[in-house]
From Swiss-Prot:
Cell division protein that is part of the divisome complex and is recruited early to the Z-ring. Probably stimulates Z-ring formation, perhaps through the cross-linking of FtsZ protofilaments. Its function overlaps with FtsA. Homodimer. Interacts with FtsZ. Belongs to the SepF family. This is Cell division protein SepF.
Amino acid sequence: MSLKDRFDRFIDYFTEDEDSSLPYEKRDEPVFTPVNSSQEPALPMNQPSQSVGTKENNITRLHARQQELANQSQRATDKVIIDVRYPRKYEDATEIVDLLAGNESILIDFQYMTEVQARRCLDYLDGACHVLAGNLKKVASTMYLLTPVNVIVNVEDIRLPDEDQQGEFGFDMKRNRVR
């Protein structure tokens, strides 16, 4: 062999990624056998675990959690606790949503917030209420009752003395209609 042939083979050794002359080797794949209901299926160690972050799975887990909380609260109906919150800034809304996610009822009084901040906070709470299947009811001019899915609220339809708005939420933007 000449020096040039050796040099070419040396270069080919490092430049080729795949040798097409070798036959394809099939890897051993794990074989799953039927498992009794009392046993848990064992995952093979060589397969990477797949994280399932799909929207449907999250919704299913959320619905299951809500059902679990509803069943749990039906069993323990000794006392009902309603937390009263006076948010002073928009960032306090996340704490209120955490309480709702923990299956607690919250009475919210927006008297220490400006109207713009209260409207923004109320929009956030309303969105969280829909996601967690809760209820948001206006009980006074600046007070709202936020309850989880398993709590039923019966509010008498009364008119407050200073209430001139027709909507359910007092912090909605007022629009002047031109006729």
